[in-house]
């Protein structure tokens, strides 16, 4: 899925803490070459924490002003579209640098949103699993040109998970049989599917680590705040066999045979927080500190519980919500749990008001963000109100309004 959206940003002062001009200029050079040398760049302070940009072109001189690298890149793309009739899209690009720069003025354009989100878990299966750095560089450039400053970054999740499972006593064979082929990894990460078309090779794991370093370095150079993966509670079959006293729940999804479905830890298991902590620590040891961590434990699946026992259901969901949050912050106390809201609409009969309230009840409001995926779906596909309306703006939690303009660019 490909998305855009809302929520948070930096401080303001008379000059930025980091160089925002150089990354923006380098990105623009990748679009128009040496012509970028003729552009004048200036920093301006954010407006009440929100990004701001200006464009001034007069007598052949083009000035781009912005409060961040992304704001300057967005200013450039706005100018190219409106003054030069050029643009960069997923379906093609037409970038022409008109000589001299056409006159144009656009003052004090303030973003209404502090964070603008892009991508979701499934994009990494539909579209990106075999991308190399050259292709990722183009996409990150496009993100900045469109104003994105909060991209999802889940490449190399399995390489980190492998390190964690080794520390938890599994061998490589037990770990590798857990993973799917690359194009199915998004659903593996959400606990929908294991083993299918796997395993992954040593070369794959090594190359994904190297690629993720390139991706994160560029995102951070541009001032973006990537969302990293976190542990969602799903464990390899080898781990289940080693711990027969733990009451794992066997999940079902998509009509796949039982051997391909996931086992999830109970929320009261001490392993949950231990593994979640290790995952965040191993990720940050490899890639550096991060703030936002994505964990999806119930995507398109229902917990195998008695639906008629409402109180037991609410209690279990509250315990899961608290445990997922604690498993992330055990590894980084400053972390924020991010989760997708797709399944709350997709399975609206399971996720009634009280059920979602229960899941969120033990997580601080400022330590969670819900990505309200697919706002074009409730009315036309699920025959419900938009999920954020059904759930009263997610009961005080921060949330991101999102659309699904296409499924991986394939239709």
Model features per residue range: what roles?
Residues 107, 131-134:
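Catalytic and substrate-binding clefts that recognize carbohydrates or anionic sugar/phosphate headgroups
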Residues 36-38, 87, 91-102, 119-123, ...:
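Catalytic-core regions of glycoside hydrolase
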Residues 72-75, 128-129, 227, 380:
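Short helix/loop capping segments that flank catalytic or ligand/cofactor-binding pockets
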Residues 61-66, 125-130, 202-203, 311-312:
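Second-shell loop/turn segments in exported
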Residues 13-113:
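Contiguous, structured surface segment used for ligand recognition
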Residues 113-132, 143:
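Active-site-adjacent substrate/metal-binding segments within catalytic domains
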Residues 1-18:
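Bacterial Sec-dependent N-terminal signal peptides
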Residues 20, 24, 72, 76, ...:
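Stable alpha-helical elements in mature extracytoplasmic
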